[in-house]
Structures are given as C-alpha cells and as structure tokens.
Design a protein with these regions (language model features):
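Acidic, turn/loop-rich segments in luminal/extracellular domains of secretory-pathway
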Residues: 1-69, 74-186, 191-199, 204-209
C-alpha cells in the first residue's frame, strides 16, 4: 500500500489525495496567470515499509479572460456650462494584456441635469462606444442656474475589447460650481411723470438677479 503527500504545495495552492494521489486545487484565489504562469509541486510517495520517493512536477496554468474594472470618479464643472465626458472620466483597468476600453454602458441616468449622445437623450442601459467618447459626443448639461456639490450622480460599467463588462457598476459624480449671474430684465415702475411733478413718488427701476 502506498500513500501520497505534498512536501511542496506551491504556497497552499494545491493538495493531494493521500490514497489515490489525485492532485487538486486547494485555493483557486492564489492561481493568477498574470502573476505566474506555472507552479512547482513536490509529490512524496511512501510505501508500506516507510520508504519514500520525492519528485517535483510543474503545473502550468491556462489563461482565462477576466473582466475589466472601472473607477468611481468625480467631475467638477461650471454652472450653466455643458461638459463633454471622455474615456478618462470613467477609468479603465484590465489584468489581461492587450485588452482596452471598447465601450461604456450607462446603467442609471444622472439624478439631475441631462446626458446626451450626439444631441439625443441617453437612455438607461445605452452603450456608448469609445469612438463617440473620442469624438466628444457624450455631453452632460446641468439645469439652468443649478449648482452644488454632488449635484448629479450616474452609474456605469466599462467594457473591454473582448466584450466583457465590469460586473460591478461604478459611480460618476458631478459637482457644479456656482457663478455670479449678472443682473437682467430691467423694468420701470412707471414711464410717465406729471408736468411740474414733485419727487414724492418717482418711478423706479427694478432688476431680476
């Protein structure tokens, strides 16, 4: 009767069945192709008399396509000013070499203001291609005279060049900085004054700020 054991588990990544010698994955979270494409394990076989034999094997990993990640971000704009959103506003990272941002899906619309693509209102779930982002077609516009920190929030998911989406949506927050509006709409309380009138109740100008 023989028994099997591992004298080198590759840092806890692998285990072996003592009776059958079947090698299994002990901790899959430690298997990362981008960090290491192979690992060495050392198998020890022991016979009934207690004699042992050790041999080291190389376990090669197969790469799998992993989902990308976006980034929570904040954009600060000026009151009454439209802002063009670019790829940089959404962030993108992917552990797979060669994968790049291909699109952004708008999961929920801004809580205030409007979001348009080429002048047309964006709908929840709409996919915005990177070509449109590069062309400046995605535009956020706050409501007239509106401002404030955290004025609007929207959620989004980035997509890589293999059409995988980030499984966890991110949030884009828009801060709108107030500006001092110039006075407008002058009006006159009356446009006639009686001949030789005394200045008891002269006409007055009024302005809406």
């Amino acid at each position: 009767t023989k028994s099997y054991s591992l004298t080198n588990t590759a840092g806890g990544r692998f285990a072996i069945n003592r009776t059958t010698g079947a090698l299994t994955v002990a901790n899959s979270t430690l298997l990362n192709y981008e960090a290491a494409t192979s690992h060495a394990v050392t198998v020890r076989v022991t016979d009934r008399g207690g004699l042992t034999y050790d041999e080291t094997f190389t376990i090669n990993l197969t790469n799998v396509n992993e989902a990308p990640s976006g980034t929570n971000a904040t954009v600060t704009i000026t009151e009454d000013t439209a802002h063009v959103l670019t790829a940089a506003n959404f962030g993108f990272s992917d552990v797979d070499a060669g994968d790049a941002l291909s699109a952004v899906r708008i999961d929920t619309l801004p809580t205030a203001g409007t979001l348009t693509l080429s002048g047309t209102a964006v709908t929840a779930g709409q996919v915005i291609m990177t070509a449109d982002l590069a062309a400046g077609q995605l535009v956020f516009t706050p409501a007239a005279d509106a401002n404030g920190t955290g004025y609007a929030r929207m959620t989004f998911s980035v997509r890589d060049s293999t059409s995988l989406y980030d499984p966890t949506p991110n949030t884009l927050t828009v801060n709108v900085t107030a500006v001092n509006d110039r006075p407008a709409d002058l009006s006159l309380s009356a446009n006639m004054v009686a001949e030789k009138a005394t200045p008891i109740d002269p006409p007055r100008f009024r302005s809406r700020l």
